[in-house]
Regions:
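Generic structural "secondary-structure junction" signal
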Residues: 35, 44, 53-54, 64-65, ...
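Cys/His/Pro-rich metal-binding microdomains
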Residues: 36-39, 53, 98-101, 105-108, ...
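Auxiliary Fe-S-binding modules of radical SAM enzymes
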Residues: 1-46, 240-373
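A generic "binding-loop/recognition-motif" signal
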Residues: 48, 100, 201
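Conserved Radical SAM active-site core
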Residues: 57-192, 360-370
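Iron-sulfur (Fe-S) cluster-binding segments and ferredoxin-like electron-carrier domains
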Residues: 41-65, 109-119, 324-330, 349-355
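Conserved AdoMet/S-adenosylmethionine-binding subsite of the radical SAM
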Residues: 124-285, 290-293
Length: 373
């Protein structure tokens, strides 16, 4: 890219909601600035905000209006992200802000992702406070979630750096809708990511997400091939929208060919929400068919989610096919992995594992972050 892209400045002191941001350039008209953070490339006049509604042209520079602000903090099981092969059973301090750079009609977190009220992100915390809270709460990791952390990349990156200094892992739960110029700066600070691959056609992304598929595929390929990030993928299957067996076959073949067979794939059930309420939940049979398609394509770790299906929430050894992690909901029932290998046949198990699993279970603990400042 020949144009000069402004990167995030080093600003040690800030007022929440007014942190100067990065990844933008001046437009040729000399009036607008163009946000380069995501593939939309929103051109903003003074006072304008982008599609995400949280990145603003303020006095000729991008300002992150949700930096230091959150819609809430909660300690969750890591499997809820979902990440089934990243320190299983451990607790993760989760938080998000407001806004999103996609416009999914089926969004399950639409009260936050589609919020136009930045003041709804009423809790404030700096990165060091979040890292300290994670340590004091006994959390193995911090997750940037609930809404897409890409649009608050500066806040996520600074928090990830503080967490790394404190010995805490970081997780991005994201759509992967990020530009090439911002991609490495964001993901190089993350230890794990669950990326939503929402469908596998451009028509689906255009009609249901107001976005494009190709940038997501580019992000997934970059994470798998050029980063050390532990990657898992979620595919929410929506009846009549992205549930074609042929499309699922193409998606699974692409994952194996481009990312490798060891990337876990979660097939998640749709429930009517936000604007997409004209159809029922995903039939369990559709999830089971998708599971079988993925196995036949060669994906080694496959899960179902948002349904009661205990058998397909276990982690199976790709060698002997025995369950090396048995689960009941978010509770770990048994753990047969030692030094990254199956204890039954010694085949390697892909993931990031401690010697013993965590014991957080299914608990959900809301956190008042002000108590940790």
């Amino acid at each position: 890219m020949s144009r000069k892209v402004t990167l995030p400045p080093d600003v040690p002191d800030f007022t929440p909601g007014s942190r100067p941001g990065g990844w933008w350039h001046e437009s040729d008209d000399g009036v607008r600035i163009v946000c380069d953070l995501c593939p939309r490339g929103c051109a903003l006049r003074p006072g304008d905000r982008g599609f995400c509604f949280v990145r603003e042209n303020r006095q000729g520079q991008i300002v992150s209006t949700t930096y230091g602000r959150s819609t809430g903090f909660c300690v969750d099981p890591i499997e809820k992200k979902p990440l089934n092969q990243f320190f299983p059973g451990t607790a993760v301090l989760s938080f998000g802000t407001a806004g999103c750079n996609l416009g999914c009609t089926f969004c399950q977190n639409w009260t936050m992702s589609r919020s136009r009220d930045v003041e709804a992100a009423c809790e404030t915390a700096d990165p060091a406070t979040i890292a300290s809270a994670a340590v004091r709460l006994g959390c193995q990791s911090v997750a940037f979630t609930y809404n897409d952390p890409i649009i608050w990349a500066e806040y996520a990156i600074d928090t990830a750096k503080a967490c790394r200094q404190a010995g805490v892992k970081t997780v991005a739960v994201t759509s992967g809708y990020i530009s090439e110029v911002a991609r490495s700066a964001f993901y190089e600070q993350m230890d794990a990511a669950n990326v939503d691959l929402k469908g596998f056609t451009e028509d689906f992304y255009r009609q249901y997400c107001a976005g494009r598929l190709q940038p997501v595929l580019d992000t997934l390929r970059w994470i798998a091939r050029q980063s050390k990030v532990w990657l898992e993928i979620t595919n929410l299957i929506i009846p009549g929208a992205n549930d074609s067996p042929e499309d699922i076959k193409r998606m699974c073949r692409w994952i194996v060919d481009e990312l490798g067979p060891d990337v876990p794939l979660h097939f998640s059930a749709f429930h009517p929400d936000f604007k997409l309420t004209d159809r029922g939940p995903t039939p369990i049979g559709t999830l089971l068919e998708a599971y079988d398609i993925a196995r036949q394509a060669g994906i080694r770790y496959i899960y179902t989610g948002n349904v009661i299906d205990q058998e397909r929430q276990h982690t199976y050894c790709p060698g002997c096919r025995r369950a090396v992690i048995e689960r009941s909901g978010y509770d770990i029932l048994s753990f047969a992995i030692q030094a990254g290998r199956c204890m039954f046949c010694q085949a390697p198990i892909a993931g990031r594992f401690a010697d013993v699993p965590g014991t957080w279970g299914s608990r959900r603990l809301p956190v008042r972050i002000a108590n940790y400042s």
